[in-house]
């Protein structure tokens, strides 16, 4: 089954017929050059698809990166002046169709003869992810969410209504426009906003897309059994294998190269990228292009303008939109044609797009018993620890923290544990530290975290000073892609009329998929390469669980904490339920409803 895309000569597909097929070499590819702006996951994926499926010579592919390291938001470093730094983590699942299509071909750096996908698959089979404590309250006590969503019937109906709403009816609407306290006061909303970092003022459209995209994982939402994680941080587990693959293919990495604009010749609806303006180590220069040169640009960035603190300094600094960087580049491109999107919709209000994370590294054994009491696992076992975030339900910062398999860094001291902490509310005073998170040093953030672990108050300061080191990172635009939007605010991957230019990443438009995922980056890269180069192979469509009645039935029962949707009070319509159900007696519909626990004894 195939469905035509709005991308030149490309289409979506599903099933393994095309998944296992190799496309022929596109005509004329040896005469082309590709310039990729940025070296984050989307950019590296585009380069990999050019090599693997486009069969472009590696020496014809040029990656232009402003920094001196690849990876973009997929970072993970040891800074000798600060400590270990992870700005975020990557939650993945089995139906990231484009991501796994790519990583089946990227050799593992850890297991000889295996792919990154092989390594990841074996790891998560042998050490499956699940949480034993999803949330705490009263300073480290289990909040006993117990896998329940605690939604009222009215709350369930609000979610159902959003689920059924057309995209265009949600343009520029916020979550607050479609939900009320029936949802916001539920455990469902605690799970949802802490796991995905949604705020009440974010896009109702994106909320709906998330719900539809991951409907098959509703049952795994309370305990994170739906999730899978890499062995190490995302830089070492995902970025480095891709970089090695590309270097082996002869791809050129040009670091310290800041692209400031792409100049277009636009005539009669035809858009041709003619030049790239850039600075190489601060010196202005340019690249002249022909129609045979392909340009791929990652527009916007969730980690642009990150401000770093350390143990004794808060991440203070200018968090305004920079005159340089990804946002400025997109703005310069967007000025040339409306088809290139509206970056100001996403980067103009950092009070609504920021949050702060911190990496806490333990230095001895003193904090570990408090961690182990909550997660009920040995943090230094090398296996799953928290199994996803633990949210401090009554935290003023809405603090959450997680410990993935240790060490999170390949060269990490085996006696140390790296903890990732983040707070959704950065501008309100804490519960132990009486000032906003954004004004806190690393030590003070550790103190607030220790308070919510249940450490005795008279020990907190000493442990934060001597038993841990913390690196806070303030990210002004981390949820910029969640801001309310309308059609055209995000440009198409290949904007209408573009001959040799495509956008990549989280701020492009592609149907049905959801931002803030590794899959979105890789999907847009695949669509861009296949569309511009004419790769004759289908792009895997977004997993179609939203169209699978079995998944819809299962998720409905789960969302209602085990009650059947048929048990809902429909008022005057209650009297017709039994007669209508009698019509399906003895049919495959009855069997389907019984198999998925919707139809129960006594209902017919």
Question: Which positions does each model-derived feature cover?
Answer:
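Glycine-rich FAD pyrophosphate-binding loop
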Residues: 51-78
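Rossmann-like flavin
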Residues: 109-216, 228-229
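Short, small-residue-biased leader/transition segments that mark boundaries at the very start
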Residues: 2-7
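Helical element adjacent to the flavin cofactor pocket in flavoenzyme catalytic cores
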Residues: 212-294, 299-300, 312, 318-327
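Conserved FAD-binding subdomain of flavin-dependent enzymes
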Residues: 81-122
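Beta1/beta-strand and adjacent pyrophosphate-binding region of the FAD-binding site
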Residues: 26-42, 62
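C-terminal segments that line or cap access tunnels to active or ligand-binding sites in enzymes
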Residues: 215-230, 292-294, 299-524, 530-544
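Active-site-proximal substrate-binding core of FAD-dependent oxidoreductases
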Residues: 531-590
């Amino acid at each position: 089954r195939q469905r035509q895309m709005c991308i030149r000569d490309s289409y979506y597909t599903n099933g393994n017929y095309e998944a296992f097929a190799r496309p022929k070499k596109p005509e004329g590819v040896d005469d082309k050059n590709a310039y990729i702006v940025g070296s984050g996951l989307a950019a590296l994926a585009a380069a990999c698809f050019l090599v693997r499926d486009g069969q472009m010579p590696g020496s014809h592919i040029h990656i232009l990166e402003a920094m001196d390291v690849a990876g973009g938001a997929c970072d993970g470093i040891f800074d000798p002046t600060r400590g270990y730094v992870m700005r975020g983590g990557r939650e993945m699942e089995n139906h990231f169709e484009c991501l796994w299509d790519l990583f089946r071909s990227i050799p593992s750096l850890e297991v000889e003869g295996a792919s990154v996908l092989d390594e990841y698959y074996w790891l998560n089979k042998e050490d499956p992810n699940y949480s034993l404590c999803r949330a705490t309250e009263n300073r480290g006590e289990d909040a006993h969410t117990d896998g329940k969503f605690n939604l009222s019937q009215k709350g369930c109906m609000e979610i159902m209504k959003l689920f059924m709403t057309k995209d265009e009816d949600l343009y520029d609407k916020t979550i607050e426009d479609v939900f009320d306290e029936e949802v916001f006061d539920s455990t469902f909303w605690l799970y949802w906003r802490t796991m995905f970092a949604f705020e009440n003022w974010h896009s109702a459209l994106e909320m709906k897309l998330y719900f539809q995209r991951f409907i098959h994982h509703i049952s795994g939402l309370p305990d994170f059994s739906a999730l899978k994680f890499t062995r190490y941080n995302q830089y070492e587990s995902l970025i480095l294998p891709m970089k090695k693959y590309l270097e082996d293919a002869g791809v050129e990495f040009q670091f310290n190269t800041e692209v400031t604009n792409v100049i277009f010749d636009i005539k009669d609806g035809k858009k041709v990228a003619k030049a790239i303006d850039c600075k190489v180590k601060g010196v202005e220069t340019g690249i002249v292009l022909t129609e045979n040169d392909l340009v791929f640009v990652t527009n916007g960035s969730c980690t642009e303008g990150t401000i770093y603190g350390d143990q004794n300094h808060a991440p203070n600094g200018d968090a305004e939109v920079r005159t340089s960087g990804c946002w400025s580049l997109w703005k310069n491109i967007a000025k040339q044609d409306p088809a290139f999107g509206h970056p100001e919709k996403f980067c103009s209000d950092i009070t609504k797009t920021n949050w702060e994370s911190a990496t806490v590294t333990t230095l001895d054994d003193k904090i570990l018993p408090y961690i182990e009491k909550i997660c009920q696992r040995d943090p230094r076992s090398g296996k799953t620890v928290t199994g996803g975030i633990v949210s401090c339900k009554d935290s003023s910062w809405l603090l959450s923290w997680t410990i993935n398999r240790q060490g999170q860094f390949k060269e990490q001291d085996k006696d140390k544990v790296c903890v990732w902490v983040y707070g959704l509310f950065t501008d309100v005073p804490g519960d132990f530290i009486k000032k906003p998170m954004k004004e806190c040093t690393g030590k003070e953030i550790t103190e607030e975290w220790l308070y919510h672990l249940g450490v005795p108050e008279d020990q907190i300061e000493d442990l934060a000073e001597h038993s841990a080191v913390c690196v806070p990172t303030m990210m002004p635009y981390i949820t910029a892609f969640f801001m309310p939007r309308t059609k055209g605010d995000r440009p198409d991957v290949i904007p209408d009329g573009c001959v040799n230019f495509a956008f990549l990443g989280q701020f492009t438009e592609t149907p049905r998929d959801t931002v803030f995922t590794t899959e979105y980056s890789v999907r847009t890269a695949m669509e861009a390469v296949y569309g511009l180069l004419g790769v004759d192979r289908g792009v895997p469509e977004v997993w179609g669980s939203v169209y699978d009645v079995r998944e819809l039935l299962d998720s409905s029962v789960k969302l209602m904490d085990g009650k059947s949707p048929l048990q809902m009070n429909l008022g005057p319509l209650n009297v017709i339920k039994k007669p209508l159900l009698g019509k399906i007696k003895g049919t495959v519909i009855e069997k389907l409803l019984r198999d998925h626990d919707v139809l129960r004894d006594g209902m017919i």
